[in-house]
């Protein structure tokens, strides 16, 4: 998946891809971030699964010392992995901003290039009218999260002249992912 997002190490001749460097194909610019984000998410899922099974066992009366030890292990894993996932996600976002600014603009519903860009919590992106209807925004927060500066500039979708992903699916998929993570 990371190669499809940030393809490197190939040449294109008459519509056919030819690998020039397998090293670059595999270890492309987004590979370490996507791998770490997905691997950590898998471990975090396992931690919650462990806690869920332990809770189920405790509710069924099988609450010996082993059940609570496993529950504590799952809770400790989650306590370490959840903040780590936020940090890895931030690094992944910075990498995506560098290599796929149109995707970031679609994820955030940013139409015009702006500094101090607001974070859109909710809204309905409209590609025809180039706006996000009923948007609930937090001023400056998108710039702070994505550039680590209140006055950071985010390129808007209008900069990409149609060369961007469909906005609504990307906008909503990102919110679903964050919602599940929260």
Language model features with spans:
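Polytopic transmembrane helical bundles with strong interfacial aromatic enrichment
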Residues: 1-182
């Amino acid at each position: 998946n990371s190669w499809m997002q940030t393809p490197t190490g190939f040449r294109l001749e008459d519509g056919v891809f030819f690998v020039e460097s397998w090293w670059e194909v595999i270890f492309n610019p987004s590979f370490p971030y996507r791998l770490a984000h997905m691997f950590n998410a898998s471990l975090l899922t396992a931690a919650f699964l462990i806690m869920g099974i332990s809770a189920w066992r405790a509710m069924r009366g099988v609450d010996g010392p082993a059940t609570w030890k496993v529950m504590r292990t799952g809770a400790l894993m989650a306590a370490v992995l959840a903040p780590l996932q936020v940090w890895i996600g931030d690094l992944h976002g910075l990498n995506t901003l560098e290599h796929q600014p149109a995707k970031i603009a679609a994820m955030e519903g940013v139409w015009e290039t702006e500094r101090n860009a607001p974070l859109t919590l909710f809204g309905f992106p409209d590609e025809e009218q180039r706006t996000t209807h009923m948007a609930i925004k937090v001023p400056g927060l998108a710039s702070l999260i994505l550039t680590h500066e209140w006055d950071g500039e985010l390129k808007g979708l209008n900069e990409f002249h149609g060369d961007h992903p469909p906005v609504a699916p990307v906008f909503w998929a990102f919110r679903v992912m964050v919602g599940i993570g929260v």
